[in-house]
Curated annotation (Swiss-Prot):
InterPro entries: Cupin_8, JmjC_dom, JMJD6_ArgDemeth/LysHydrox. Its cofactor is Fe(2+). SMART domains: JmjC. It catalyses: L-lysyl-[protein] + 2-oxoglutarate + O2 = 4-hydroxy-L-lysyl-[protein] + succinate + CO2. This is 2-oxoglutarate and iron-dependent oxygenase JMJD4. Fe cation binds at H188, D190, H268. It is found in: Cytoplasm. The keyword Iron applies. Its EC number is 1.14.11.-. Keywords: Cytoplasm, Dioxygenase, Iron, Metal-binding, Oxidoreductase. The gene is JMJD4. It comes from the Eukaryota. One of its GO terms (cellular component) is cytoplasm. GO terms for molecular function: 2-oxoglutarate-dependent dioxygenase activity; metal ion binding; peptidyl-lysine 4-dioxygenase activity; sequence-specific DNA binding. The lineage of its organism: Eukaryota, Metazoa, Chordata, Craniata, Vertebrata.
């Protein structure tokens, strides 16, 4: 991050609401063609800060192993190579033809069985008695770390979600998707209202994107979001009373090799127009961590409303709300504190101790922080201070047993502010 971008980002987040998700006044999505003329600061300033979508050309993925090895000369999935590398893996597969609790039910299948199904599905004219099956949310990089699959583009390298979950060795938010023509993902916004990027290794996708706030017009009379935003039933004003106030979606057709950047809080629906393989990351950083925090507060409030009748007779009602929230979203307030702590401590370490040559040569969070520069670390700490201050003042957070937090939030905040002041001297 250069000084001009640091000044721009500091001014933006000082002047605007911490939960601002940006506006989108046109239907045009920028196409980034040339690597050599597009810098990290360009992306940060023009897309991350204002929370706007864009598409990167296939030039940004030309060197990836998956594009060389997973695809035939004709641009189709190379089933033989994939079977050779991953045939015995167990993978999550969704049935696109079945709706279950506003999503598609999943099962675990051997990868070789899924590929056999896919080949038969193509042979039968894209029909099967088993329905349209879509391999989704496969943690391939975690299961096969030795594979030369891809390199995360520098534009997406400030990735707090995967930095934290890698540190605690529990989970990650790096996925591979594989599916036949006609497979699709229902209407949704991404986990924690995170950013996402999605790279097509082969095939084509159609994206329908709705800027933050537009989803409110798509809710039914009970406040529920639709499963499919293209369904004719949305025209029924007795069920969807505000649908006619919604704007048409922003539509993107993504070609092979291209990367789509989906901003924070944008709801979307996605179709595979051909047999398609893609790589996806969900990620959070200093630009959208406040949006994540607002989402968590909204999620907790929804849980509290659901079990409000038990508030008086239940001694540990606030704790139960946190447990339910974590089961639904994957995180609670105390883990969110630990998330902020890990991010903060990694940056404090860089600012206070620098980075030795051996560490910078490795693929580690500290190396990524160093690559983005000291001013980026300061920006991250400033955003962490903002959100951590809000968390510490939150009444629901203060009702929890915080004695297990190490260090206590007051001490962490003091350390953060001191590190920022020293770095800016």
């Amino acid at each position: 991050m250069d000084r001009a971008t640091f000044a721009c980002s500091t001014a933006f987040f000082h002047d605007y609401s911490s939960s601002a998700q940006g506006t989108f006044s046109t239907g045009h999505v920028d196409f980034i063609d040339k690597i050599e003329s597009f810098t990290y600061s360009d992306f940060f300033r023009d897309y991350l800060i204002p929370n706007q979508p864009c598409v990167f050309s296939e030039k940004f993925t030309d060197g990836w192993g998956s594009r060389r090895n997973w695809v035939t000369w004709g641009g189709k999935p190379d089933f033989d190579h994939l079977l050779q590398e991953f045939g015995e893996a167990i993978v999550p597969v969704a049935n696109c033809d079945v709706k279950e609790y506003n999503s598609n039910p999943k099962e675990q299948l051997p990868f070789k069985e899924y590929i056999s199904y896919w080949k038969e599905y193509i042979k039968n004219g894209y029909r099967s008695s088993r329905g349209c099956l879509y391999l989704k949310d496969w943690h391939l990089s975690r299961a096969f770390p030795e594979q030369d699959v891809y390199t995360t583009p520098v534009y997406f390298s400030s990735d707090w979600l995967n930095e934290y979950w890698d540190a605690i060795a529990v989970d990650d938010y790096r996925f591979v998707y594989m599916g036949p023509k006609g497979s699709w993902t229902p209407f949704h916004a991404d986990v924690f209202r995170s950013y996402s990027w999605s790279a097509n290794i082969c095939g084509r996708k159609k994206w329908l994107l709705y800027p933050p706030g537009q989803e409110d017009y798509l809710k039914d009379c009970h406040g529920n979001l639709p499963f499919d935003v293209t369904a004719p039933g949305l025209q029924d004003r007795s069920v969807y009373p505000r649908y006619n106030q919604s704007q048409p979606p922003v539509e993107i057709v993504q070609e092979a090799g291209e990367i789509v950047f989906i901003p924070s809080g944008w709801h979307h629906q996605v179709y595979n127009l051909e047999d398609t393989i893609s790589i996806n990351h969900n990620w959070v950083n200093g630009c959208n961590v406040a949006i994540m925090w607002c989402f968590l507060q909204d999620e907790l409030a929804a849980v509290q409303r659901e079990i409000n009748e038990w508030k008086d007779p239940m001694d540990d009602w606030h704790l139960q709300c946190q447990l339910i929230m974590k089961s639904c979203t994957g995180i609670d307030y105390k883990e969110f504190y630990n998330f902020l702590k890990v991010i903060a401590e990694n940056r404090i370490s860089i600012l206070e101790n620098g980075l030795d040559d051996e560490a910078s040569a490795k693929n580690t969070p500290k190396a990524a922080i160093s690559t983005l520069g000291m001013l980026h670390a300061v920006f991250d700490l400033k955003r962490t201070v903002k959100v951590l201050t809000s968390l510490s003042a939150n009444e629901d957070f203060k009702k929890l047993d915080l004695t297990s937090l190490s260090p206590p939030q007051e001490a962490l905040l003091h350390h953060l502010k001191a590190a920022i002041d020293t770095a800016l001297l």
